[in-house]
């Protein structure tokens, strides 16, 4: 069940999987403001919801979202919320509440893909929602540790379930048209969403320092996100226009990894 049946990974869903999607207000949590830009009504409604959320918190809009969504008619063996909520004033998430309030199932599971203590998710309303699940699945040991520091009473419910990776497919993709880097320079690669928590600004400032020491290094950024223009502006201000290359969102980021000298991670927080 998808709030909005869009995104780069839609084509990866096997044909035998039955995809459902909603037409309630929850669909706006599955789209960006840019996604709505071609339909003025959707653009306006999502913008209003996001503004109210920013001013008064997600708890101010959840009753409206829930009233717009009917209870799903099918009773399931298990319902899984695969997206955690973020900070209470971010227009993000809502899947936990959807599963708890609008899905009938024998068991309900919530996945965690964040550092619960650092990303702003540790708040009264999010904590109350997690108490309603039978199991919380954390994607790593560190992710679980952060969560149970916030909610030690749920330690028995919280299990580690690592993310699934298709290693052979990844190796094959890395071998498909590997990106060729110029000789004579150190090529550093970051593959990340260009958002605050990824700390790409720190990488750019570090690059400026290293180049000032006379080291010829280029930073390659694969990904897009809300901070892209801000990061471009920072690169320009530091005189790094030729040293920071924005490759945008790539269907196959692995081909950039094949020949890179260094893979860099500068996240402020992560579910590691």
Model-predicted regions and their roles:
Residues 1-60:
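N-terminal strand-loop element at the rim of the active site
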Residues 186-209, 215, 226-232:
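A conserved mid-protein helix/loop that constitutes part of the nucleotide-sugar donor-binding site
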Residues 219, 227-230, 241-250, 256:
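Active-site donor-binding acidic/aromatic loop of nucleotide-activated sugar
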Residues 142, 164:
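Carbohydrate-associated surface elements
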Residues 50, 54-58, 67-91, 109:
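Short N-terminal targeting/anchoring amphipathic segment
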Residues 91, 95-96, 107-109, 113-128, ...:
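Nucleotide-sugar donor phosphate/pyrophosphate-binding loop at the beta->alpha transition
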Residues 248-249, 265-271:
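Short Ser/Thr-rich beta->loop micro-motif in glycosyltransferases that lines
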Residues 172-187, 211:
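Nucleotide-sugar donor-binding and catalytic loop/hinge architecture
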């Amino acid at each position: 069940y998808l709030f909005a049946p869009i995104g780069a990974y839609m084509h990866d869903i096997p044909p035998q999987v039955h995809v459902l999607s909603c037409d309630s207000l929850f669909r706006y949590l599955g789209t960006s403001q840019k996604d709505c830009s071609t339909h003025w009504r959707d653009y306006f409604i999502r913008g209003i919801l996001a503004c109210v959320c920013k001013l008064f918190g997600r708890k101010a809009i959840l009753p409206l979202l829930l009233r717009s969504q009917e209870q799903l008619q099918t009773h399931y063996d298990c319902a899984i919320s695969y997206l955690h909520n973020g900070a209470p004033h971010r227009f993000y998430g809502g899947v936990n509440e959807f599963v708890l309030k609008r899905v009938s199932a024998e068991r309900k599971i919530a996945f965690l893909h964040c550092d619960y203590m650092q990303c702003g998710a540790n708040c009264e309303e999010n904590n109350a929602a997690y108490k309603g699940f039978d199991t919380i699945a954390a994607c790593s040991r560190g992710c679980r540790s952060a969560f149970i520091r916030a909610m030690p009473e749920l330690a028995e419910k919280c299990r580690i379930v690592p993310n699934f990776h298709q290693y052979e497919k990844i190796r094959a993709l890395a071998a498909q048209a590997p990106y060729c880097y110029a000789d004579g320079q150190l090529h550093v690669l970051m593959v990340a969403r260009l958002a605050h928590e990824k700390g790409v600004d720190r990488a750019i400032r570090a690059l400026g320092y290293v180049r000032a020491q006379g080291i010829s290094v280029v930073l390659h950024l694969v990904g897009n996100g809300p901070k892209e223009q801000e990061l471009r502006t920072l690169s320009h201000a530091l005189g790094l226009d030729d040293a920071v290359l924005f490759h945008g969102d790539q269907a196959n980021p692995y081909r950039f990894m094949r020949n890179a000298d260094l893979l860099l991670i500068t996240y402020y927080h992560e579910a590691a």
